[in-house]
Amino acid sequence: MKKFFEGLKNFIKKEPVLFAALLLAVLAVCLIRPGLELCLQAIDFRTLAILFSLMIVIKAFQSQNFLDFIAARLLRLCKTRRALYFLLTYLVFFSSMFVTNDVALLTFVPITLLIFRRIELPALHIVVLETLAANLGSCITPMGNPQNLYLFSYYSFSALEFFALTARIALPSLFILAVIIVFLTRRKLADHGGMAEPHELSGNVLQTQVVRLKADFRTALYFADFVICLLTVFHVVNYLIMLGFTIVVMAVCNWRLFKKVDYSLLLTFVGFFIFTKSLSKVPAFTDFVNSLLSSPLKTYLTGIAASQVISNVPAALLLSGFTENGAMLLLAVNVGGLGTLIASMASVISFKLYTAENHDNYFVVFTAYNIVLLIILGIIVYLI
């Protein structure tokens, strides 16, 4: 019994969101008794299949050193600290649109820490910037993060509708990130009358980052699989065809990739699907949530607030069942990825990577950046 509770404690510590989702689903099934048929109807198998396929094909790209290779080549172009900040930040921003925010951070934060050790500069602010860039860049495409993929399917957005909405986040974000970088990399020199000047990088410290691309027949199959995944997202290819193709490709090319899929995220979705559908059968709860989502502004504020407490993916799953205003909810949970450390679980990744090697006040700096940007961007996005 002692081992059981120790195991449970470790599981909760490792997977708190998954534990909460499963617990809520079990409680809902026991108390509300929705029935097996309703539970199966609640699960969006298409979203789960696309999410699974995207996760495994991105792991495949990582196994080929694809992102590392591109990053290493581009970094050789940097001559100043400002250029390095811009390149790293926007690499994360644009790559997160296609490989998700967490993969972008898992790829580029370690590279960033290595580079900044070599050039003997503190990496605190650039890692925070990369985290902001990952969360904001991933907002732009349906496959950029799990909540976008789910909401794109749930509300049946057209591609034009979706990108018109996410552009309201993308355009201000690009400008704000640029302003922050220029401010951070200014260098006040007395002999320049206090004007700002970017630091130059001495020597060839960025030339030593050697990464070899593992280009072979598998790379071509992975690209084909990725294209099929994108076509499935936009309803061109049936999700069962995509799933079958993905399973065959990965089984032939590298079956070990199946072990690297984040199955806890898939189970988290299942838990919240069942919990939300079950609660929709409780009139009192439905009336309460509907009152919180009764107007576009209320939906926007509720989505942001919920994201701060339970993270934006669960917020999207929970609130989507109670509002037809998909546009405002989409904006809310993406803007709501800013703010607290758990507002976007991708933020926890960079926090762990940075604090494993450094012991300065990352949490304070991260929170300060995020709260300020949440307020500024939250107002801008709503008013546009």
Language-model features: locations:
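Juxtamembrane and boundary regions of transmembrane helices in multi-pass small-molecule transporters
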Residues: 2-3, 160-212, 342-384
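Membrane-interfacial loop-to-helix junctions in multi-pass transporters
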Residues: 45-47, 75-89, 118-126, 217-220, ...
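Membrane-embedded hairpin module used as a gating/binding unit in multi-pass transport
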Residues: 177-181, 189-190, 194-259
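Hydrophobic transmembrane alpha-helices that form the pore/transport pathway of multi-pass ion
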Residues: 89-90, 94-139, 150, 316-331, ...
